[in-house]
Regions:
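Polytopic membrane enzymes that build or remodel cell-surface glycoconjugates and lipids
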Residues: 1-267
Length: 267
């Protein structure tokens, strides 16, 4: 999914650079393949023009033209999906395993959703503990008066203010945040229920935004903080080694859980 989405982003920029129709036709098929791989790709309808805005000075008209094949590919995909799958039976929404928010009122539902969005941020920084299944109430019900809910709202309110205030500056951190939020939005339960509170795999594409912000901080921001070149290089290498070692240990330890179906569902 991510591979095809990034290839589509590449061909969008190729069109904007060359203004040749062949890139629009190629992009239609690439984006359609990405949608067939996973429908989360549809969030790149926003990411691609956003990327053009942040990293180029192309005309708005040409940017809009560049996403026409993406829109057409999305329409074709949705028509095919609807004809094969149809709509979800309403009775599924009355089953806890398909609707983890069953029995919650409006404020409880959205406070819990914002809490899960903060959990996603935490997992980006500190991916422990991990699980294959966030079954109903694995994530606790969070009420509006719960400090966890208040804290979650304040975090995303602060991020929203930061995005609004720095959007015109084309800040890399703003782009990274938007990449994280937009690609996660389709699996956030805000737009529509997806049947689970959350899942770690839902932030695979979103992790691109986190990685971009982290690397930008190390390469562009940290040298301005640490003026001494040798100290900066030592700090940079130390931080990269820490990340490499800790994440490698976590990856290897999680691999053991995937040895068999039995181990997977008992870990």
């Amino acid at each position: 999914v991510l591979l095809f989405s990034l290839i589509s982003l590449y061909f969008s920029f190729k069109y904007l650079e060359k203004l040749k129709l062949k890139y629009l036709f190629i992009n239609f098929f690439i984006f359609f393949l990405a949608l067939l791989a996973k429908e989360n790709t549809i969030t790149f309808l926003a990411i691609i023009p956003l990327s053009a805005y942040f990293f180029s000075n192309y005309k708005a008209r040409n940017i809009l033209i560049s996403i026409i094949p993406l829109i057409l590919a999305s329409v074709v995909f949705l028509i095919i999906r609807q004809s094969i799958i149809g709509t979800t039976p309403e009775k599924l929404e009355d089953e806890l395993m398909n609707n983890p928010f069953l029995g919650m009122n409006f404020t409880e539902k959205f406070t819990t959703i914002f809490y899960t969005l903060v959990v996603y941020l935490r997992l980006m920084i500190f991916p422990h503990p991990l699980t294959i299944d966030y079954y109903p109430y694995h994530i606790p019900l969070v009420k509006l008066t719960d400090l966890r809910g208040i804290f979650s709202f304040l975090i995303y309110l602060g991020l929203s203010v930061f995005i609004i205030r720095n959007f015109k500056k084309k800040s890399i951190f703003v782009y990274s945040l938007l990449l994280f939020i937009i690609t996660l939005s389709i699996a956030s339960n805000i737009l529509f229920p997806i049947g689970v509170f959350m899942n770690e795999r839902f932030i695979f594409i979103s992790s691109l935004g986190f990685s971009l912000a982290f690397i930008y901080f190390l390469i562009e921001i940290m040298p301005k903080i640490i003026k001494n070149k040798k100290v900066y290089q030592a700090t940079f290498l130390s931080m990269m080694m820490i990340v490499f070692l800790l994440y490698s240990v976590k990856t290897i330890s999680r691999n053991r859980a995937w040895e068999s179906s039995f181990k997977l569902f008992t870990n």
